[in-house]
């Protein structure tokens, strides 16, 4: 892969984590698909035993004005955060977790023009965190991240916009 390739960057980051002493198991699964998540959990259980914590960072930025957005397009944006969180909750209901971190966005609080689905998905994470903290002993935190400078959806969106402008 090219040095600037997204896959190469991810591989370098994983190798750096491994050099620091972590055991890493990479699994490709759609967090919104319960069957895929059950298969992933089975592999994790076989490799490591019990899960002690979760960092849920899946998401799709989406975009487009609500007046012209289709239900299918909104569902694609909502699914990783809403269905994904619910799937993780169901899948790990019988597991005592030390922590459950949800990577939300400041857009849940501020809103972003043209991203009603993304804002709603992140608001769901915040509400889910509140619910879990009031009904379980698992520390559940929803972090309202702002734009990251070097990684994440915002960087990819800007790169995509740059490519369209250059053409």
What feature does the model see in each segment?
Residues 1-167:
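4′-phosphopantetheine-dependent carrier domains
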């Amino acid at each position: 892969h090219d040095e600037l390739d997204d896959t190469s960057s991810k591989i370098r980051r994983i190798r750096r984590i491994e050099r620091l002493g972590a055991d890493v198991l990479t699994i490709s699964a759609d967090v919104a698909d319960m069957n895929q998540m059950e298969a992933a959990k089975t592999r994790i259980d076989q490799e490591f035993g019990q899960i002690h914590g979760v960092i849920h960072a899946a998401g799709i930025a989406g975009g487009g004005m609500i007046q012209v957005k289709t239900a299918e397009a909104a569902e694609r944006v909502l699914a990783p955060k809403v269905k994904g969180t619910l799937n993780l909750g169901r899948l790990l209901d019988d597991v005592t977790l030390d922590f459950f971190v949800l990577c939300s966005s400041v857009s849940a609080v501020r809103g972003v023009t043209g991203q009603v689905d993304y804002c709603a998905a992140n608001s769901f994470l915040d509400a889910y965190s509140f619910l879990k903290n009031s009904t379980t002993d698992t520390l559940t935190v929803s972090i309202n991240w702002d734009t990251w400078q070097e990684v994440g959806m915002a960087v990819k969106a800007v790169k995509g916009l740059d490519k369209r402008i250059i053409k």
